[in-house]
Amino acid sequence: MDPFLVLLHSVSSSLSSSELTELKFLCLGRVGKRKLERVQSGLDLFSMLLEQNDLEPGHTELLRELLASLRRHDLLRRVDDFEAGAAAGAAPGEEDLCAAFNVICDNVGKDWRRLARQLKVSDTKIDSIEDRYPRNLTERVRESLRIWKNTEKENATVAHLVGALRSCQMNLVADLVQEVQQARDLQNRSGAMSPMSWNSDASTSEAS
């Protein structure tokens, strides 16, 4: 089964009936009332949102918004795990950004607006993020980073993030991002060298 559908099925099976009712209410502006009356599970609702392209594997913002409204941080973590897995199968730069995002989300607190502005996220979008995630600081940070990434596209790099953090005097967080990046680089180099080393050892054994 498609990994994104597996995620949605997992989320759906973890929702209570009252939470499903709340989700249906939150989606009134997106899904018609008659359609919502037919919804019997979270998966029914997610399927409708998929049909309307409101939900996609690469665009989980709405799913995050809905789960944040329910304060289901455990389910938000499943979305994080899904995105981390998707990044692992993507280009190395994408995987590096995902790792940097996790560090920043864990370590940037109430000063997230300053970082968002440094990344050229507009005040209008910052206000919108606050409205969507009134009680979830981590999701505010993550959403602002996502907006920056979608705007910058191929110009979105870890180096750019580190520079923005240092411009905001968030040097400790910048150091943490660089440490994680260096560890990843070392791991990647070790992984690339291992097969060569194995082949070298095998050749030596055969020669002896």
From Swiss-Prot:
Post-translational modification, as annotated: (Microbial infection) Glycosylated at Arg-117 by enteropathogenic E.coli protein NleB1, C.rodentium protein NleB and S.typhimurium protein Ssek1: arginine GlcNAcylation prevents recruitment of caspase-8 or caspase-10 to the activated Fas (CD95) or TNFR-1 receptors.
Region ranges (Disordered): 187-208
Subcellular location: Cytoplasm
Transmembrane stretches, start-end: none
Pfam families: Death, DED
Annotated PANTHER family: FAS-ASSOCIATED DEATH DOMAIN PROTEIN, FAS-ASSOCIATING DEATH DOMAIN-CONTAINING PROTEIN FADD
Record text on subunit structure and interactions: Can self-associate. Component of the AIM2 PANoptosome complex, a multiprotein complex that drives inflammatory cell death (PANoptosis). Component of the death-induced signaling complex (DISC) composed of cell surface receptor FAS/CD95 or TNFRSF1A, adapter protein FADD and the CASP8 protease; recruitment of CASP8 to the complex is required for processing of CASP8 into the p18 and p10 subunits. Interacts (via death domain) with FAS (via death domain).
Protein known as: FAS-associated death domain protein
Protein species of origin: Homo sapiens
